[in-house]
């Protein structure tokens, strides 16, 4: 990146006037800058708006305040910081073709960039472990991962991410020793991230590849267990249905005691698919950059600078995708509609299970409080085999009963907010 005003940047006629070719080139450059500025502004707005919406929804609606969604909040915070403190300065760097914020902010900005990516991948890794425990050890899950423990885990994720991002950069452990890099470090208008080979490889492994391998391994195990559960549900659904019909005849009350284990299981597996899409999207967006990041320090001239920047921005765009993916969840869709005032009436909002409480928060009410109380009273664990068999492969979690209140309304609720 040459300094502005270099004579090679334009053509002059003998009398000092611009040639038509130069005018055309200048117009194209201006159009490119305007187009890129609009595109980058849209990306920043999408990242900030979407993740503020996610954080607000989880904070306001008690129905969404689950342990898993605490981790989702951490992920949204990382994306929000990316949209506020990283992407705008990266856009300025590209559009202005120089760095205008000094050496200190250059290194600090780079540290925040690494922090957000590291915190995101480590949070996704924690979510994978969270789902693995939930689906393989449902009896122990609530004691192993309480909300307070989830907060501690999130704090540890950010501390570790901060140490692995800020410490090497602020201590200048990352710096290369060749002449081009040293010139850039001394130039306040240059913020190209020249790194030595050891730092590039070590930081990529610690901040990305190790958490990625753990995440993929754990989540593949989660889907294997989930697949076995679906197969067992398919085989046993008829037995559950016939047992519950007999109970209805004995009780003499239509609909009371009818269990919907398959419905619950499908909701749980849809939640797993949503989380899988989030992890897959993150991997697809960031993996190419981290591959190029290592190749670049081994063979600098092999990867064009434009490709490096493009793949870096592909990673940035990932921060705008997650709020769109969350819309797969009915609970998040309802919460977003409530926050954006897109619901036609308050009656419809109540019918979908959200209302405001005395503290100004909103919670999921089901059809009415009577339904909620009845559901809490009648929910239980349904086991396919006698106790002592393998954990959740035999028991289908806490399955709400499909019961009716005094007015004949359905009292079932969705136990999978995501």
UniProtKB/Swiss-Prot annotation:
Gene Ontology cellular-component terms for this entry are: early endosome; Golgi apparatus; plasma membrane
**Membrane topology, Extracellular segments:** 1-34, 96-106, 175-196, 299-305
Its membrane topology is listed as: Multi-pass membrane protein
User: Lipidation sites of kind S-palmitoyl cysteine?
Assistant: 265, 341
Renumbered ranges of motif PDZ-binding: 415-418
Annotated positions of the 4-hydroxyproline modification: 387, 400
Q: Where, per the database record, does this protein carry Phosphoserine?
A: 246, 261-262, 345-346, 355-356
Q: Which Pfam families match?
A: 7tm_1
- SUPFAM superfamilies noted in UniProt: Family A G protein-coupled receptor-like
Molecular function as annotated in GO: beta2-adrenergic receptor activity; norepinephrine binding
Write out the GO biological process terms. Answer: adenylate cyclase-activating adrenergic receptor signaling pathway; norepinephrine-epinephrine-mediated vasodilation involved in regulation of systemic arterial blood pressure; positive regulation of autophagosome maturation; positive regulation of lipophagy; positive regulation of MAPK cascade; regulation of smooth muscle contraction
Q: Provide the function of this protein.
A: Beta-adrenergic receptors mediate the catecholamine-induced activation of adenylate cyclase through the action of G proteins. The beta-2-adrenergic receptor binds epinephrine with an approximately 30-fold greater affinity than it does norepinephrine.
Complex formation: Binds NHERF1 and GPRASP1. Interacts with ARRB1 and ARRB2. Interacts with SRC. Interacts with USP20 and USP33. Interacts with VHL; the interaction, which is increased on hydroxylation of ADRB2, ubiquitinates ADRB2 leading to its degradation. Interacts with EGLN3; the interaction hydroxylates ADRB2 facilitating VHL-E3 ligase-mediated ubiquitination. Interacts (via PDZ-binding motif) with SNX27 (via PDZ domain); the interaction is required when endocytosed to prevent degradation in lysosomes and promote recycling to the plasma membrane. Interacts with CNIH4. Interacts with ARRDC3.
Specify the protein name.
Beta-2 adrenergic receptor
Q: Organism source for this protein?
A: Tscherskia triton
């Amino acid at each position: 990146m040459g300094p502005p005003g270099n004579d090679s940047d334009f053509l002059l006629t003998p009398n000092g006037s611009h040639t038509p070719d130069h005018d055309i080139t200048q117009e194209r450059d201006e159009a490119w800058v305007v187009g890129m500025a609009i595109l980058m502004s849209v990306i920043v707005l999408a990242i900030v708006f979407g993740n503020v919406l996610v954080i607000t929804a989880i904070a306001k609606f008690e129905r969404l305040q689950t342990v898993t969604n605490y981790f989702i909040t951490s992920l949204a915070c990382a994306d929000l910081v990316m949209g506020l403190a990283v992407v705008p300065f990266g856009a300025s760097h590209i559009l202005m073709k120089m760095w205008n914020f000094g050496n200190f902010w250059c290194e600090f900005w780079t540290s925040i960039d690494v922090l957000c990516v590291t915190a995101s991948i480590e949070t996704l890794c924690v979510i994978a472990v969270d789902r693995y425990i939930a689906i393989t050890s449902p009896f122990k899950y609530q004691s192993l991962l309480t909300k307070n423990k989830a907060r501690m885990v999130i704090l540890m994720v950010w501390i570790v991410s901060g140490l692995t991002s800020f410490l090497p950069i602020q201590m200048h452990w990352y710096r290369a020793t060749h002449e081009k890099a040293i010139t850039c470090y001394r130039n306040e208008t240059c913020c190209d991230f020249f790194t030595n080979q050891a730092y590039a490889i070590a930081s990529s492994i610690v901040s990305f590849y190790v958490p990625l391998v753990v995440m993929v391994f754990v989540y593949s195990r989660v889907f294997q267990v989930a697949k076995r559960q679906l197969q067992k549900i398919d085989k046993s659904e008829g037995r559950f249905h016939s047992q519950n019909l007999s109970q209805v005849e004995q009780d003499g009350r239509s609909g009371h005691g009818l269990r919907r284990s398959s419905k619950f299981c499908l909701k749980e597996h849809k939640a797993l698919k949503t989380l899988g899409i989030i992890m897959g999207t993150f991997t697809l967006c960031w993996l190419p950059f981290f591959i190029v990041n290592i190749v670049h320090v081994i063979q600098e001239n092999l990867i064009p600078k434009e490709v490096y920047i493009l793949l870096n921005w592909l990673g940035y765009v990932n921060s705008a995708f997650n709020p769109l993916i969350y819309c797969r969840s009915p609970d998040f869709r309802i919460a977003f509609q409530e926050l954006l005032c897109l619901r036609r009436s308050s009656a419809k909002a109540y019918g979908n299970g959200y209302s405001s409480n005395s503290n100004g928060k909103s919670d999921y009410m089901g059809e009415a409080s009577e339904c909620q109380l009845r559901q809490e009273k009648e929910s239980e664990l349904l086991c396919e085999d006698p106790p002592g068999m393998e954990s959740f492969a035999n028991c289908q979690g806490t399955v709400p009963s499909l019961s009716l209140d005094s007015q004949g309304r359905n009292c079932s609720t969705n136990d999978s907010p995501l």
